[in-house]
């Protein structure tokens, strides 16, 4: 075969594979086969000097550009007017209704009833791609002023989900948002000398980096949502436009909703607000746009905004505030960790006063100092984290000092990797109290009525220094505790006695092995079936267990090497604790060996009971949807997991369909 022809075929084939992998999330070729064809193409291009502009080899280069050139957009990239309340959306909607009624009353050709299309408002950097009459990507540009942007074509080509060639013979400009996913952000920060402050800065900084190789390291993604300019037949509706974007192979978010009433819009706002922190990327609101293009054209624009669309903005999930102090706290493992004390700031609808700082390495890497203005980010409803400092605020600030002794008990501290630990395991109150509380917890020994307040009193007044001491408690001594009468004392003793008969997985979890949670404990018990077998397990045997990696395996081995650990376990057993394992008979079913995700509310099952049912059928129950997911069981109010399953082509079952299958 002619070598040029072979190059053209390889380019077409590799671009098809890239679309399947990066846009559809479902590759039809192995990484090994892809790499083989890719390097075959590299060699052929080198040999012949023949390179197509849309070849995948043209995505990343070592070029460092001298400057950014200007690019004049064919069609303006408008900003959107913003609303933060439903009342503001109502006012906008009423203006649209009034316009429609007046127009239809005076015009021979009526406009259709109002229909709105809702899409997510991505928090990244707006980009405009232009494709020539051959469908080849010729320019990628930033929004800039809306009329003129910066040419970032080389940077845009590093985004692997962006097609370098499309099946379209009209000159085209398409608008989208370059974003950085949480996964890409965390991976980059784990390896970077200077960590990124947030996802948006990560995307914007990458596209505006003259060193294209640096842009590529950030592994950006993109979503497209608008055709700004197109020669040829115009679109009649926004939905028609979105369908065009999808059929041309551009990556799109799968959340697109049609609404005709304010109640429907409110419902969608509430839904997206609920799931926004579960997403793998940042959004800061919803875009609400009129579907009919002719209605849009007649409504027109203000000086700044189109009248036919509005952005509903959520509360900020990132803010700047002042770092007042750093508090050092001791965890169950003895790790001493810093917590930032902040000047109160409103963030994502709550007042934030504290934030995570992780460790001294994290503090140094981010350049955090007392008295500085810091960037604070809140996501997934967890304690906010400090992402970095405002450089201009560093004058007059103080260095954060690492503690020399334990802040709780005054004992000597030791370094292990990037963390510091208090070695006073038995005498350090926070360690012991948290250890006892963990041991007594519902997922562990399930000692009913046990609280942190009780644990504190047992430590302070009854000299409890080990979990085995719980089984030596005496009725008379419990009566000396605050708010402990005869009934409460007896109830606690009864609950402790009852806890002796426990499952092996609960007992294993109760021991507090570092990095071993409830699920891992269950997986370990399934594999080894007894405490004795687990204690003797080799590294190779441990990592063969599903989801047990090197770190977890080493944690388990080190835990059972400790003389004190074995002493505590033996004492618990001698005091009558009886961890038992009953091998469950796994029924033959279509779910045998399959990965299943459950989302939404089921009528006949709680989360625990559906999990137990699936496991009895031989399924692995996962908390997140991926290409490896086999089934998603969707109940009422199914959320983002349902949407992701749909986009990946994962089989979705209703509760009724699930029950019919079993």
From Swiss-Prot:
<keyword id="KW-0862">Zinc</keyword>
<dbReference type="Pfam" id="PF14520">
    <property type="entry name" value="HHH_5"/>
</dbReference>
<dbReference type="InterPro" id="IPR013840">
    <property type="entry name" value="DNAligase_N"/>
</dbReference>
<dbReference type="GO" id="GO:0005829">
    <property type="term" value="C:cytosol"/>
</dbReference>
<dbReference type="InterPro" id="IPR003583">
    <property type="entry name" value="Hlx-hairpin-Hlx_DNA-bd_motif"/>
</dbReference>
<keyword id="KW-0479">Metal-binding</keyword>
<keyword id="KW-0235">DNA replication</keyword>
<dbReference type="InterPro" id="IPR012340">
    <property type="entry name" value="NA-bd_OB-fold"/>
</dbReference>
<keyword id="KW-0464">Manganese</keyword>
<dbReference type="InterPro" id="IPR033136">
    <property type="entry name" value="DNA_ligase_CS"/>
</dbReference>
<dbReference type="InterPro" id="IPR041663">
    <property type="entry name" value="DisA/LigA_HHH"/>
</dbReference>
<dbReference type="InterPro" id="IPR036420">
    <property type="entry name" value="BRCT_dom_sf"/>
</dbReference>
<comment type="function">
    <text>DNA ligase that catalyzes the formation of phosphodiester linkages between 5'-phosphoryl and 3'-hydroxyl groups in double-stranded DNA using NAD as a coenzyme and as the energy source for the reaction. It is essential for DNA replication and repair of damaged DNA.</text>
</comment>
<feature type="binding site">
    <location>
        <position position="422"/>
    </location>
    <ligand>
        <name>Zn(2+)</name>
    </ligand>
</feature>
<feature type="binding site">
    <location>
        <position position="313"/>
    </location>
    <ligand>
        <name>NAD(+)</name>
    </ligand>
</feature>
<feature type="binding site">
    <location>
        <begin position="31"/>
        <end position="35"/>
    </location>
    <ligand>
        <name>NAD(+)</name>
    </ligand>
</feature>
<feature type="binding site">
    <location>
        <position position="428"/>
    </location>
    <ligand>
        <name>Zn(2+)</name>
    </ligand>
</feature>
<dbReference type="Pfam" id="PF12826">
    <property type="entry name" value="HHH_2"/>
</dbReference>
<dbReference type="GO" id="GO:0006281">
    <property type="term" value="P:DNA repair"/>
</dbReference>
<dbReference type="InterPro" id="IPR001679">
    <property type="entry name" value="DNA_ligase"/>
</dbReference>
<keyword id="KW-0520">NAD</keyword>
<comment type="similarity">
    <text>Belongs to the NAD-dependent DNA ligase family. LigA subfamily.</text>
</comment>
<dbReference type="InterPro" id="IPR004150">
    <property type="entry name" value="NAD_DNA_ligase_OB"/>
</dbReference>
<dbReference type="Pfam" id="PF01653">
    <property type="entry name" value="DNA_ligase_aden"/>
</dbReference>
<feature type="domain" description="BRCT">
    <location>
        <begin position="586"/>
        <end position="662"/>
    </location>
</feature>
<protein>
    <recommendedName>
        <fullName>DNA ligase</fullName>
        <ecNumber>6.5.1.2</ecNumber>
    </recommendedName>
</protein>
<keyword id="KW-0436">Ligase</keyword>
<dbReference type="GO" id="GO:0046872">
    <property type="term" value="F:metal ion binding"/>
</dbReference>
<keyword id="KW-0227">DNA damage</keyword>
<dbReference type="GO" id="GO:0003911">
    <property type="term" value="F:DNA ligase (NAD+) activity"/>
</dbReference>
<dbReference type="InterPro" id="IPR010994">
    <property type="entry name" value="RuvA_2-like"/>
</dbReference>
<dbReference type="GO" id="GO:0003677">
    <property type="term" value="F:DNA binding"/>
</dbReference>
<feature type="binding site">
    <location>
        <position position="177"/>
    </location>
    <ligand>
        <name>NAD(+)</name>
    </ligand>
</feature>
<dbReference type="Pfam" id="PF00533">
    <property type="entry name" value="BRCT"/>
</dbReference>
<feature type="binding site">
    <location>
        <position position="143"/>
    </location>
    <ligand>
        <name>NAD(+)</name>
    </ligand>
</feature>
<keyword id="KW-0234">DNA repair</keyword>
<dbReference type="Pfam" id="PF03120">
    <property type="entry name" value="DNA_ligase_OB"/>
</dbReference>
<keyword id="KW-0460">Magnesium</keyword>
<dbReference type="GO" id="GO:0006260">
    <property type="term" value="P:DNA replication"/>
</dbReference>
<dbReference type="InterPro" id="IPR013839">
    <property type="entry name" value="DNAligase_adenylation"/>
</dbReference>
<feature type="binding site">
    <location>
        <begin position="79"/>
        <end position="80"/>
    </location>
    <ligand>
        <name>NAD(+)</name>
    </ligand>
</feature>
<feature type="binding site">
    <location>
        <position position="406"/>
    </location>
    <ligand>
        <name>Zn(2+)</name>
    </ligand>
</feature>
């Amino acid at each position: 075969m002619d070598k040029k022809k072979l190059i053209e075929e390889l380019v077409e084939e590799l671009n098809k594979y890239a679309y399947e992998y990066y846009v559809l999330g479902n590759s039809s070729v192995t990484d090994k086969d892809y790499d083989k064809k890719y390097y075959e193409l590299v060699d052929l291009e080198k040999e012949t000097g023949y390179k197509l502009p849309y070849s995948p080899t043209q995505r990343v280069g070592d070029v460092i550009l001298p400057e950014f050139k200007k690019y004049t957009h064919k069609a303006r990239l408008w900003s959107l007017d913003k609303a933060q309340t439903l009342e503001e959306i109502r006012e906008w909607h009423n203006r649209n209704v009034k316009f429609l009624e007046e127009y239809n009353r005076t015009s021979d050709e009526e406009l259709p009833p109002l229909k709105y299309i809702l899409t997510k408002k991505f928090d990244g950097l707006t980009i405009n791609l232009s494709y020539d009459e051959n469908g080849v990507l010729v320019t990628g540009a930033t929004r800039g002023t809306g009329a003129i942007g910066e040419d970032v074509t080389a940077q845009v080509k590093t985004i692997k989900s962006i097609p370098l060639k499309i099946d379209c013979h009209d000159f085209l400009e398409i608008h989208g948002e370059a974003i950085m996913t949480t996964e890409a952000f965390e991976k980059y920060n784990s390896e970077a000398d200077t960590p990124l402050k947030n996802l948006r800065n990560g995307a914007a900084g990458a596209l505006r980096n003259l060193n294209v190789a640096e842009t590529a390291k950030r592994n950006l993604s993109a979503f497209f949502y608008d055709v700004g300019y197109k020669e040829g037949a115009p679109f009649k509706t926004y939905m028609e436009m979105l369908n065009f974007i999808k059929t041309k192979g551009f990556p799109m978010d799968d959340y697109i909703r049609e609404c005709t009433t304010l109640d429907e819009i409110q419902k969608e706002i509430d839904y997206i607000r609920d799931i926004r922190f579960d997403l793998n990327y940042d959004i800061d609101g919803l875009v609400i746009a009129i579907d009919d293009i002719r209605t849009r054209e007649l409504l027109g624009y203000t000086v700044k905004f189109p009248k036919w669309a509005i952005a509903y903005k959520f509360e900020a999930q990132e803010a700047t505030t002042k770092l007042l102090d750093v508090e050092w706290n001791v965890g169950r493992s003895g790790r001493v960790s810093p917590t930032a004390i902040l000047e109160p700031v409103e963030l994502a609808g709550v007042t934030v006063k504290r934030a995570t700082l992780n460790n001294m390495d994290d503090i140094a890497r981010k350049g955090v100092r007392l008295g500085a203005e810091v960037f604070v980010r809140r996501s997934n409803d967890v304690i906010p984290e400090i992402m970095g400092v405002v450089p201009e605020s560093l004058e007059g600030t103080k260095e954060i000092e690492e503690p020399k002794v334990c802040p709780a008990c005054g004992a000597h501290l030791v370094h292990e990797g990037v963390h510091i630990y208090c070695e006073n395991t038995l005498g350090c109150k926070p360690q012991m109290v948290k250890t006892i509380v963990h041991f007594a917890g519902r997922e562990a020994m399930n000692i009913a009525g046990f609280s942190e307040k009780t644990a504190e009193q047992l430590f302070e007044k009854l000299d409890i220094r080990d979990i085995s001491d719980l089984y030596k408690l005496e009725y008379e001594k419990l009566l000396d505790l605050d708010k402990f009468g005869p009934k409460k004392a007896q109830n606690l003793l009864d609950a402790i006695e009852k806890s002796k008969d426990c499952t092996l997985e609960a007992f294993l979890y109760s021991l507090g092995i570092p990095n071993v949670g409830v699920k891992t404990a269950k997986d370990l018990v399934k594999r080894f079936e007894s405490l004795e077998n687990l204690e003797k397990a080799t590294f190779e045997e441990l990592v063969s267990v599903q989801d047990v990696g090197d770190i977890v395996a080493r944690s388990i081995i080190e835990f059972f090497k400790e003389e004190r650990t074995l002493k505590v376990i033996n004492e618990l057993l001698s005091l009558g604790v009886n961890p038992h394992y009953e091998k469950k008979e796994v029924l033959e079913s279509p779910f045998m060996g399959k990965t299943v995700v459950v989302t939404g509310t089921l009528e006949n099952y709680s989360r625990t009971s559906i999990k137990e049912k699936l496991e009895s059928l031989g399924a692995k129950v996962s908390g997140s949807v991926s290409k490896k997911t086999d089934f998603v069981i969707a109940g009422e109010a199914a959320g983002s997991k349902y949407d992701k399953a749909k986009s990946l082509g994962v089989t979705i079952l209703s509760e009724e369909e699930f029950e019919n299958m079993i």
